[in-house]
Amino acid sequence: MKNSIVVLFLLISLSACSQNSEYNVSSYQTEGTKAPNTHYIGEAWLNAIIHDDTELGYNITKATFKANSTLDWHTHSTAQVLIIVDGEAYYQERGKDPLILKVGDVIKCEKDTEHWHSSTKQSDVTYLALYGSGKPTAWTEVLTQEYYDEIAKMFLHD
């Protein structure tokens, strides 16, 4: 009798697992993989939550940058929306003043608009980036540590 009950529980568990395998579930809470230091200085992790989904037509990526990390100037071939879920970020579009984004802030960057965004000098940042399935990011100019430090000093005086 005990063996029958054990077998029954195992079958129910296997059945539940097979039912769950019918779904493609990902989590934005997963840190992701450490990004190679190609277009930034510091430490960053990326989690491609939804990537190249042709039915949806957009991607969702979670990015986490440690404090005092930079991200180079770049453009996207589609609009991009950033949703700040933890920490604080610097954000700047070419020709405009930089600003600080905080938890709960949502900002849209129009397609082909040159911009950069990253953690602040004192705070890590985690954000969700929503963007279309267009061409890859076009990296346009290195954001120097000196320029980043100038931005940080500017906000210390505010």
Predicted regions and their residues:
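Sec-dependent N-terminal signal peptides
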Residues: 4-14
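A short, N-terminal "cap"/entry segment at the start of jelly-roll beta-barrel domains
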Residues: 17-57, 138-158
